[in-house]
Amino acid sequence: MGGISHVGSKKSCYAIAYARNNTPKEKIFGIDIESQKHYIFFQKKDEFYDVFLNKNEQEEIEKLLKDQAYLYLIIFSAKESIIKAFYLKYKQIIDFKNIKFKALDGAFLYFYLRQESLIEITLEVKVYFFHTNNEIITISCIEN
């Protein structure tokens, strides 16, 4: 079991991956990598935000007084990593809007996730993020 993510441009391409044996009681991880340059997509507030954030999340993020375009990019990447981990665990696709941003604490983001399918799945997910010179990397973990 494992995961992969990549980001590229005309000049360079980067990938991040992991692989491990799967046992039923182990944690499930999801990873994502984004170019820090992609923050420009988040500088202009438009309908793009509505694709991955509900209105309440947008209001909560605006209260944080951080570099908001950069924070939006980190949250987008974190949700991508959660979607990947969720699929590995449950073999289901989850919508961005079913993953709700809760809090930012240092290098960690916290989310509340709810998926209604054959069974209702409700989780709290912790996502670690860090950056290199040019990329943002997020790693989510779903506990078994």
Language model features by range: what are they?
Residues 1-144:
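Conserved nucleotide-ligand handling architecture
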